[in-house]
Amino acid sequence: MASPDEDGRPSLPNPWDAILEAVKHQLPSLDSDSSASDCEDEELFIFQRNQTVLIPDLSEELADDPAGAWVTSSGSPPGLAAVPVESAMEPWGEWNAWPRPKESAPLEGRAPSKSSSLLRMSAETPPRQDDDAGGTLNTSASQSPRQGPQGEATRSPQEAGLQTEPLGAASQAQEGSDAASRKALRRERRKMIEKDILHKVTWDGRNPACPDASRGKEKACDAVEVPSEGPPGCLPVLSLQELEEWDLDQVLLSLTGREEDRGDGAPGAAWWAAGRLQGQDHTEPSTQDRLMERLSLLCARQSRETCRAQPGYGTARERVGSSSSSGHLGRRPLGLSCPPARVLSVRRLRPLEIRPGPALG
């Protein structure tokens, strides 16, 4: 089959023989039924059979191949079929595609180990060349500007970042200026509130154009200043210190008097001072007198309604009530426009006593 080499190993013309030689002891026989532990001659004879018997006969299946890649000879015994050159060199297809070096050309006279090592080396070299070529292509592509679909050069991410930095700095500067303007507006508002609003309710911040400001401070009775007829822009100045000294009861009574005021008495601006000033001549009745008058009118109205429901009350009593009401209204001030009311006396008239006369005979 082959002549022995210098090292004592048979030289194989085909690499498939080397592969079969390596895996020969791992392929079992088709008719091996007994275990390998038996040491009989029959078992030894099974493993000493011909090499072609160890591989199943696939000639019939390969003959049905339409491509006709596998060719079998009619006179050859059933065994290994003839293998075409392209399929035999299939494991080394990548190596065949590259230019074959001069040293690896004659492989027929070398041992399988040497040929396999050379094949491994030659198979490993092309990817390195691919990597080198890819690296050169990548470096050249990175150096040259990228072009878009229309031939325009697109900018790299670094250039885009350099261009976006000035935009970001401008936006930050604009935000900083906006924040500074907001702070300035807030400060101006605080100053305006402190000067224009808070100083108006204190005596130190009153308007000097108001002529009665100093006079009101001296002549104020208990709490507030009486606004006089001054310039229209002069506003009443209040003091927080004097607001705490106000008499709430007196303020409530003065409010009730203000509701009844119609303009004939004291002026509307000084409605609260009319009832509080003592020792001065004034024609307006006090608040207590007004309240008592209203109570008397209410009682008279209710009594009149009850008296009308009772029989026996004639026109004389109405006359008495009208006379008493007219006399009472004479004491009322003319400034109050209240409807006239009739006041009836609560005293009841005694019923007439009828004495029986002497009996006639």
Swiss-Prot record:
InterPro entries attached to this UniProt entry: DNAAF8 (IPR031531)
Biased composition (Polar residues): 136-157
Residue ranges of the region described as Disordered: 65-191, 309-334
UniProt entry keywords in alphabetical sequence: Cytoplasm, Phosphoprotein
Main location: other
Keyword Phosphoprotein: yes
Biased composition (Low complexity): 321-334
Name of this protein: Dynein axonemal assembly factor 8
